[in-house]
């Protein structure tokens, strides 16, 4: 056929651990002033217990795509809201980090199959204008040999707290590179 459209919506609201600045009494924003998010999951010290479930985190968005047998093209939008304003002390090393109470990320993705080749990629932009992109190709050259190449470029000011794209570091920011891979299965017993 001519293809079809697919739509997916998502939403989440939960309490998360965060360091609250209790000394900030002059803040004019709604909600507490947050100095950082806690990601360890530990609640064994007094400070960690104070940080437990300190603020509400809300995520919402959707993805729409057009799909045919060989082509998929989509767009994604995601919006995040935090129950307080993140007000980190910005230093040289973190000057481009997210420092607000909400963020929107928009993106477009594609995948094209042609014979034994799969070309794919995604481009994304955060609310502050930071961009991230990756593009790749997988090739099945033979039943025993496959080849892959992936280019990635995550700008220093890209802000997406939940992204988990292919990267060297744990965050998808300030990184550019190319990955090349070869998979070989010389015999049918090769794992």
Identify the role of each PLM range:
Residues 1-2:
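Hydrophobic or amphipathic alpha-helical targeting/insertion segments
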Residues 8-12:
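Outer-envelope exported proteins of Gram-negative bacteria
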Residues 13-17, 81:
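Amphipathic alpha-helical scaffolding segments
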Residues 17-50, 98-103:
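A subset of solvent-exposed loop/turn segments in beta-rich extracellular surface proteins, enriched
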Residues 18-28, 85-89, 161-163:
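Outer-membrane beta-barrel and related beta-rich outer-membrane complex signature
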Residues 57, 62-88, 97-191:
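Exposed, low-structure sequence patches enriched in small/polar residues
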Residues 94:
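Residues lining hydrophobic/aromatic ligand-binding pockets adjacent to catalytic sites
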């Amino acid at each position: 056929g001519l293809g079809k459209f697919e739509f997916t919506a998502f939403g989440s609201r939960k309490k998360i651990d965060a360091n609250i600045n209790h000394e900030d009494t002059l803040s004019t924003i709604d909600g507490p002033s947050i100095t950082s998010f806690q990601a360890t999951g530990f609640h064994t010290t007094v400070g960690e217990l104070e940080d437990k479930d300190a603020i509400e985190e809300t995520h919402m968005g959707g993805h729409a795509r057009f799909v045919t047998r060989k082509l998929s093209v989509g767009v994604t939008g995601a919006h995040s809201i935090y129950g307080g304003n993140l007000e980190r002390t910005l230093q040289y090393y973190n000057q481009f980090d997210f420092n607000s109470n909400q963020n929107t990320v928009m993106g477009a993705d594609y995948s094209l199959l042609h014979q034994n080749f799969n070309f794919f990629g995604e481009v994304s932009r955060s609310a502050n204008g930071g961009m991230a992109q990756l593009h790749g190709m997988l090739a099945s050259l033979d039943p025993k040999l496959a080849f892959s190449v992936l280019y990635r470029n995550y700008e220093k000011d890209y802000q997406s707290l939940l992204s988990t794209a292919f990267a060297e570091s744990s965050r998808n920011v300030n990184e550019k590179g190319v990955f090349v891979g070869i998979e070989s299965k010389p015999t049918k017993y090769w794992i």
